[in-house]
């Protein structure tokens, strides 16, 4: 390393010396140029043609003497014009500048050498920490390596188990936040193999109201089709998509005519997937916000009871799924927040109203497992902080309105946006004067 720096210093030193020499040469050349360009007196211009010829001849002779090789000659008595005093002064000044410029160049090199030696003598310093610390969550029990994500708030302990927090802003209700699982990217499974309670998992669907495609909606389709294949029930992705779309469009038509009421159809009579289907609309889409901003069918929620042949893991506690559509992230803040709140009201309202039905009283839904709605394909240009804040406000409004006796579970997402949003709402609820 020192050899490299020594080569660089030698190059800089040589450059400085060359700069000084060039400065001296430039000063000499400038003075010669000035001497040659001195104008003749006005009287000479008025001389006769004969005098002009003499002047031309003598001028040529003078130029031959000036540009002849050898040391510079002094002006002879035959020179046309005497040397100007200002020219001599400029030449002397330039000759004085040359050694000064050389000395400055050498001084710069010596200063650079001194600084480099000082830095080389100091011990190496630790690199500065990044502006935003990022620490990985603890490994899942499977001991598979998990991706790192943002560090949660200081008051939130980091444990490999699901994080359970009680929120005063939600009526002293416990909320579970899942950590990374052993699956790809650490995502939470839709359903557990051996659940202790009946969980309804929310499918973040699409504006077309069908099950399938990409993302979480595609994962639901794959899970249902795999269970059907295991039980030797012929079911393709195209058939599932068409069947789910037809049922949910029929339900939405009925629910929009009766907002705030749980509507149902006996889908088990003609469906290979659903035993019974319900829909709930808290706010009719496109009445409070513009669907051209948020997307179609936002705010409607569908609750399906799956048939045993397609129930995940074959466990009857996993036979409930919820389907909803989040607003498009590029919508205006007012339209987005209103549509997001209507979506959460639809989810919690559908479960709350279902638990009041004869089927729900016998076998109620005990927990709702949610992704961070709107953070995937339909996020657009909206930031995660904005989504987390909208989610927290919507959850608080839904719990306050329906007060359901269910547990809320948020699926793992690396940014912990849902957790951060609810923690912010909790601080505002406890310390309203601080805002």
Swiss-Prot record:
**The keyword Mitochondrion is assigned to this record:** no
Is Transmembrane one of the keywords?
yes
- Membrane protein topology class: Single-pass type I membrane protein
Signal sequence region: 1-20
**What does the UniProt entry say about where the protein is found?**
Parasitophorous vacuole membrane
The biased composition feature labelled Low complexity covers: 141-153
Q: How does it assemble?
A: Interacts with host SAMM50.
Q: What is this protein called?
A: Mitochondrial association factor 1 form a1
Q: Which organism is it from?
A: Toxoplasma gondii
Q: Which gene name belongs to this protein?
A: MAF1a1
